[in-house]
């Protein structure tokens, strides 16, 4: 089984980082095409936004490693502050995370 951590961007420029085993299904859930999870992004969809996948990271040995990477990506994004474009903030955090010797520990 493959594990993914993904980055979504909304039509309004918002971003979301999450983890899944099925990228296509998860994006459909975020866009409320099918039921299941995705509560945080569902509000935006109700306001007329749609989500697209900007990218993903794969190659995690197990689900806990993917969740650890997701958590670190989200938290590293915060160090760039709110003045930076949300997508730029997420991409800078991803760059920093991938530069670490052990990004999942």
Task: Report the location of each language-model feature.
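Residue-level detector of short, conserved catalytic/binding motifs and their immediate flanks
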Residues: 4, 16, 51-55
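GIY-YIG nuclease signature motif recognition
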Residues: 5-10, 14-22, 26, 30, ...
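Conserved short loop/helix modules at catalytic or binding sites
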Residues: 23-67, 72-88
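A cross-kingdom feature marking charged/low-complexity
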Residues: 84-105
């Amino acid at each position: 089984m493959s594990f993914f951590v993904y980055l979504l961007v909304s039509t309004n420029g918002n971003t979301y980082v999450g983890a899944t085993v099925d990228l296509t299904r998860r994006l459909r859930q975020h866009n409320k095409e099918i039921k299941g999870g995705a509560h945080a992004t569902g509000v935006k969809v109700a306001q007329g936004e749609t989500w697209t996948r900007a990218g993903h990271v794969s190659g995690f040995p197990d689900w806990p490693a993917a969740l650890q990477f997701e958590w670190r990506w989200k938290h590293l994004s915060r160090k760039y502050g709110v003045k930076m474009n949300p997508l730029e903030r997420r991409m800078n955090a991803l760059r920093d995370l991938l530069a670490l010797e052990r990004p999942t520990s």
